[in-house]
């Protein structure tokens, strides 16, 4: 998928996902498929959110190539965003959403970890 800027998103795989989650206290994983037209539209939106939430590490994973991780996190629909905090899943965001909605959902996922 040509719209991915490697400087903005870390690519993770079945093998590297666990280390990624362990290494980054606050992280967001965007799950996608190459043939998904919505995923192509979604990347620029998530990229913009990643710039505004610069204290969070963003990564992407092609679930066609990484079926084990997709199964482990029950990813059946793309695009899907998984929000992690301290190695735990805090929220799943499924389907296309606006930039405002994504940013708000991510912020709320982290806000609930402190109550």
What role is predicted for each listed range?
Residues 1-27, 105-115:
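N-terminal leader/targeting and pre-domain segments
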Residues 11-12, 31, 47-50, 54-68:
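Thiol-based oxidoreductase modules, predominantly thioredoxin-like and allied folds used
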Residues 3, 30, 41-43, 65-68, ...:
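Mobile acidic interaction elements
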Residues 73-84:
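Structural micro-motif
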Residues 18, 67-70:
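Short hydrophobic/charged patches on amphipathic alpha-helices used for structural packing
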Residues 82-115:
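Non-catalytic, surface beta->alpha helical segment in thiol-disulfide oxidoreductase systems
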Residues 16-49:
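Local sequence-structure signature of Cys/Sec-based thiol-disulfide redox active-site neighborhoods
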């Amino acid at each position: 998928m040509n719209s991915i800027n490697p400087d903005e998103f870390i690519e993770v795989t079945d093998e590297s996902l666990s280390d990624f989650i362990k290494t980054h206290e606050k992280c967001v994983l965007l799950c996608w498929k190459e043939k998904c037209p919505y995923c192509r539209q979604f990347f620029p939106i998530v990229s913009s959110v990643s710039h505004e939430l610069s204290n969070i590490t963003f990564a992407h994973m092609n679930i066609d190539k990484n079926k084990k991780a997709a199964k482990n996190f029950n990813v059946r629909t793309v695009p899907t965003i998984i929000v992690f905090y301290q190695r735990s899943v805090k929220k799943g965001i499924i389907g296309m959403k606006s930039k405002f909605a994504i940013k708000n959902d991510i912020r709320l996922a982290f806000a609930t970890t402190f109550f």
